[in-house]
Amino acid sequence: MKVVILGYGSIGKRHAQNLKKLGHEVIPLDLNYKLRFDVDCAFICTPTQFHVNHATEYIERGIPVFIEKPLTYNMEELEKIESLVKKQPVISMVGCNLRFHPSLLKAKIIASTRRVIYARAETGYYLPFWRQEDYRKSYSASEYGGIVLDAIHEPDYLYWLFGDIKDLKMVCDKVSNLEIKKEDIAEIGIIFESGLSASVHCDYLMKNYHRKLDLYMPHEVISFKIQPTNIMYKKEVQYFLDCVKERKEPMNNIKEAGYVLSKILEGSGYNPSKAYINQTAPEDIKEDR
């Protein structure tokens, strides 16, 4: 297949490398390049605030789109793209690479076959270590970023494991002196329609990479460490391209991803327009210099 990748940052380059290894023709485009439409599908890997506009260009032409997470950053943009795909259906998928992680595939089997009574997801990594070039110039640090949208993988895979969400509440804040405009720490509580409850912790503060899922059962707790691996990205890309080839609707299409995102954007305790400008942390919790 011929695939255009719009946005050639770290995730765009990763997708390009994986696509080439899978034998596909890749056309990488940065923001200042003219869009190409002579392709079989498009990967939208630009900063979050451009996702909807760039995806729209391809959707209106009936070209399948893969959009990196998060789908967008506010309800207005979300409603715009949801309205578009209702009028003009197209094969679409939003990034959900953790659904392809070996540890979470095992968790999926357990969640489907055993009685889970509670779930706890955690993720954290110090932002300057995560965004290694200059974190202050990354989308994470911008008004369109923040740890809640950066860590949308956790609510997404919990939804994938346990189904529709009845209620979602959160507490989020900026507690460090990282030079960012949004929250750097959050606690999210979720109640599913099944009655199961779960919680998520996410932050930009942990100096060592940390990501795990704990599934509580009546007589034991099973923990899943979620270590970085390229395997999940390759499987994600192959899955999407198989759907394009077979003209099959992928999981986590725009409608499904929009459902989870809307729960977060509308969740009690989260204000997507709030910026933590010029806030600094107390001296005793500032990070090491």
Put a short name on every predicted segment.
Residues 177-186, 191-242, 250-251:
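NAD(P)-dinucleotide binding in Rossmann-like oxidoreductases
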Residues 98-168, 176-179:
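Predominantly a Rossmann-like dinucleotide-binding segment in NAD(P)-dependent oxidoreductases
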Residues 80-97, 115-119:
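Rossmann-fold dehydrogenase core element
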Residues 61-63, 88-91, 196:
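A short helix->loop->beta-strand "cap" motif at the edges of active sites that frequently abuts
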Residues 1-37:
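N-terminal Rossmann-like dinucleotide-binding module
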Residues 20, 32, 41-46, 193, ...:
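C-terminal helix-rich "cap/oligomerization" subdomain common to oxidoreductases
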Residues 15, 32-84, 287-288:
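Beta-loop-alpha module in the N-terminal Rossmann-like domain of NAD(P)-dependent dehydrogenases
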